[in-house]
Amino acid sequence: MRRIVVTGMGMINSLGLNKEDSFLAIAKGECGIKHIESFDASAFPVRIAGEITDFDPTEVMNPKDVKKAGRFIQLALKATREAMKDSGILDAHNRCPEELANRMGVSSGSGIGGLGNIEANSIFCFEKGPRKVNPFFITSALVNMIGGFTSIEFGIKGPNLSSVTACAAGTHAIIEAVKTILLNGADRMLVVGAESTICPVGIGGFASIKALSTRNDEPKKASRPFDKDRNGFVMGEGAGALVLEEYESAKKREAKIYAEFAGYGESGDANHITAPAPEGEGAFRAMKMALEMAKVEVGYVNAHGTSTHYNDWYESIALKNVFGSKEKVPPVSSTKGQIGHCLGAAGALEAVISIMAMNQGILPPTINQETPDPECDLDYIPNVAREKQVDAVMSNSFGFGGTNGVVIFKKA
């Protein structure tokens, strides 16, 4: 079987515009959740989010092209530019060299894509007529345009894939890239998960199904994974990117190697459109598959940990079941308490965070652990990051519709 390694990483979220700043803030236990600034949310039951307020899309795009790309695409370009530069693949013109282009692909993921663009253009259409719809609307909203824009940006001519699996999309994008390399469809893949749904219809829609925390007066305490007083997730936005590469190709060009891909697991709940399967049965099967493939001792788990009642409870049960007992479960944390739930971007972001945690020997905390929940009784690295050397990390992502993805990385 072909070995696959990580040779480049990048991310942007409410705590940082790059991976170094982001991880430093996460390790410090900082929180990027605050009151929404991008629109007037005063009439909404939810008025908080993990919003990125200091990102200028003209840093990664020609100003005249900004209107052609939805914000989720702009965030993807920011993260992928960092990852591609980090990988050392780019030539003097910031392009994938022609001799590598045909054997490099893109695997992207997003849960909803250009929701804000859909909302805005729907209003234009109904209020001002169809002639007022932006001619760039469709191509700014389609999920697979992440791959379209990034492949054009870097001259990547291999497989161009897209995963649309709600909150598991970023993780499934990693898995699809792995499968492509394993089957010799490419030697390297640029993976990116991106999401930006902090808009009236996004907040309103998730609030209407009681999925979001209403702790509006305490934004930084609103997302509290595994805490007894949790009452919903907080929307985040961002993008995470990784360059996955066949080991021999990476060694040949003397690339820096961050980690080696060890295993993946996928499953479906066939249970409910929003609720997880009882006791996390689907999550258990995905984790079991990943662990059986990886054959490593996992030292840290970045949990899906959304700060919703059933997800956190059932994920905790699934972890105990898959590792054999409460005592055998390694340290677990959810970084969603700090940057919010970035939906389809979450899996890619959390994979980057997990790999950085492994390499730096710093396990991120689960913040806002104040009231223990007897149903969530694992070691969640409460409130303060922990210095600990681990050789392998696991990242979980579970999405609406009962779609589950798990990835494991190990030290190279």
PLM-predicted stretches and their roles:
Residues R3-T7, E30-K34, D217-Y300:
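Condensing-enzyme catalytic core mediating Claisen C-C bond formation in acyl metabolism
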Residues V6, A27-T165, A194-G205, V298-N311:
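Conserved beta-ketoacyl condensing-enzyme motif
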Residues E127-N134, H172-I175, K179, S196-K252, ...:
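Glycine-/small-residue-rich "gating" segment that lines the acyl/pantetheine channel
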Residues E20-A27, G116-P130, T180-L183, I203-N216, ...:
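A glycine- and small-aliphatic-rich helix-loop capping segment at beta-alpha/alpha-beta transitions
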Residues M1-D65, E248-E260, V352-T366, K410-A412:
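ACP-dependent fatty acid/polyketide chain-elongation machinery
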Residues E37, G185-N231, Y264-P278, G305-D312, ...:
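Acyl-CoA/ACP chain-elongation machinery
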Residues M1-V6, N94-A101, K295-E297, K328, ...:
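Flexible, low-complexity linker/loop segments at domain and module junctions
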